[in-house]
């Protein structure tokens, strides 16, 4: 598992809030750093896949365990 440089707790938030919060958090990172997001919205799976494609950031990991969805996104650039 990759270590995250920043964590975002998006549990209990519904679309589009997890993506909006992730976008804000990613903007605070330097290129190459990793954001770990924990969400409970099942729709976030497709949202984060699309978010990564649109922004050029790399979705390193997408897992689901006990109703929680965990994403690791590496900021593009650098």
Annotate each language-model stretch with its function:
Residues 16-60:
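Amphipathic, hydrophobic secondary-structure cores in small proteins
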Residues 11, 40, 74-76:
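Generic beta-structure capping elements
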Residues 49-78:
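C-terminal structural segments of small proteins and small subunits
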Residues 2-28, 70:
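N-terminal first-folded block
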């Amino acid at each position: 598992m990759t270590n995250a440089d920043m964590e975002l707790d998006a549990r209990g938030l519904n679309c589009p809030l997890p993506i909006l919060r992730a976008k804000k958090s990613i903007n605070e990172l330097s290129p190459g750093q990793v954001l770990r997001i924990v969400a409970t919205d099942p729709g976030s799976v497709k949202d984060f896949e699309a978010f990564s494609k649109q922004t050029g950031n790399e979705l390193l990991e997408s897992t689901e365990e006990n109703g929680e969805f965990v994403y690791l996104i590496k900021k593009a650039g650098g």
